[in-house]
Amino acid sequence: MPSTVAPIKGQDHFLNLVFPERVAAAYMSPLAQKYPKAALSIASLAGFLLGILKLITFPVLCAAGLFVFPIRGLISCLFHKSFQGCSGYVLATFLSLFSLALTIVGIVSCITWAPGFIFPMISVSIAFATVETCFQIYTHLFPALEHKPSSSLKIEIAAAKLPRSSSAPDLNYPSLPTQSASPSQRFSA
């Protein structure tokens, strides 16, 4: 019996492993809709703390993905008796391998750099990890807010739908002056 739920893509498997706060934020989304100020405060604090730890947890979770994703893919293949559910796990395994390889290359290349360059790079990496963690939390905590048009856009859409009378001037496109100005008057402004 085919399932009506869309399969989770490989990149989602990978991001859910590397950013476990995505899963927690999606789970807590109904509460965040009720208490948005408290949710933003908690999300900011969690993003800051988890972002600092992300420099350590990212390579560890990528390495764990090299073992977890193939096993979950095999279990999915055996459970569904087809290779259709396995492709997402294969992609997630390759994403884990690629991310771990880039991390190892970055660490090894840091050996040849001067300490005056390494420490600012570490602080930039921590800042990037914190921002990315906050972004992952926010987008999964408030998923309904992503596609709502802003109020100014609603006003523009409503104004575009109103019928215009021929006698009312169009304020968006002012009419040209009917009198021709002399060349000296045109350049004096």
UniProtKB/Swiss-Prot annotation:
It comes from the Bacteria. The keyword Ligase does not apply. Residues 165-189 are annotated as: Disordered. One of its GO terms (cellular component) is plasma membrane. Its main location: membrane. The chain crosses the membrane at residues 49-69, 78-98, 102-122, 124-144. Pfam families: DUF5422. Keywords: Cell membrane, Membrane, Transmembrane, Transmembrane helix. The keyword Transmembrane applies. Belongs to the chlamydial CPn_0442/CT_006/TC_0274 family. This is Uncharacterized protein CT_006.
